[in-house]
Amino acid sequence: MTEQMTALAENYPAAAELLRRHGGETLLTYLGQLHHRPLPDILPSEDLLTEVRDYFTPFFGVETAGECADVLRRRRCLSTANHHHPAFEYMTVQDTILCDRWLRLQGESGAVVPFLSCANPRLDNNVYPRGMLVYDCTAPEGCLRLPFYPFKLRHACVAAVEGISPDMVDNALNRLRQEARRGSCSLRTADALERFCREVLLSDRVQRCGTLREQTTVINAMLSQRYFTDRAPQYLWMPMETRTARLLERDFRTEAALTGQLLFRRELRAALLRALDGVSGCWTGNTGGTHFFWGLDRRAALFPLRLRESAGAAALTGQNSLGEAVTVPLTQQALTEGLRDGSLLTGLFLCFLEAHFLRDFTV
């Protein structure tokens, strides 16, 4: 085992177990062993497929959106490993190509490859949603960062930030030309990136989208069509928080739905908070994660919310990036309004609850 793999195994027990069981296999052999692990459908799985189809239709049309839903219906597996951002970062590209390969091993054509991605990272996340990553370069860290968004917006959340504007693209291209003149990247790479910016980022398809969240869906579909010389698949990215918010609204309309029981019945809610305390993707007491939902403020900054109960009423409370106290009543109406106006974002627990536990999709 290489030094890097040894360090990986030491820091990540799950990776160590994976290497122990499958370290001697080829990628194709390993991919061939992955499959849906059925659970009972507690709520209709077609609800999720309807929301997927409805989300993609305005971007790609009824036929492509329908094929995306059909692929998920047949395979019952959701790729949820990636942050929602224009896919320049190398691990993201590798992961999406592996998912494409897995679907083709299952007998799919690979023309449409669906992804559910997490839109809660900040722009300064290590996958660099703030701009483009260039790997053909002489930078000491092995990649060159070309920002679209100014430094002052580095703490803004991908889910809430405005889209990449033509001025942002022009600024990035000016920086790219400077770096090429310095020899930081090859002229061939600089030419390819400039062509991409003009043909994709400045296209009507991308610029008609008002938010980075929407633009990412279009950009990544156009990017993936350039990955291969013999085929032009569309990798269709949907923010999992968007899908979860729409499913929650469906659930809230049914009084007996388990989601509402978990959120609004005091005894069940208290048991859930205790059981998931310290679990990855959930919360750790009052110090880590968030209780069910994140808050989003007018700076597009994400902040945690904590459940508080007083006089029999429950509310989510927190402090935003401006130092203001925020209180959201834990009611169907307040949560629905917050999800619609963008002041609330679903946490990972609710995202996986809706897709995996309630509607039987392997994630």
Whereabouts are the PLM-identified features?
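Histidine-anchored nucleotide/phosphate-binding helix
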Residues: 92-107
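Internal, well-ordered alpha/beta segment that forms a basic, Gly-enriched binding/recognition surface
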Residues: 116-220, 226, 235
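Short secondary-structure boundary/capping segments
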Residues: 93-96, 127-136, 253-257
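N-terminal regions that are enriched for targeting/export leaders
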Residues: 1-84, 161-168
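Non-transmembrane, aqueous-exposed alpha-helical and coiled segments at domain scale
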Residues: 52-78, 106-109, 311-363
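Glycine-rich phosphate/pyrophosphate-binding loops
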Residues: 103-124, 363
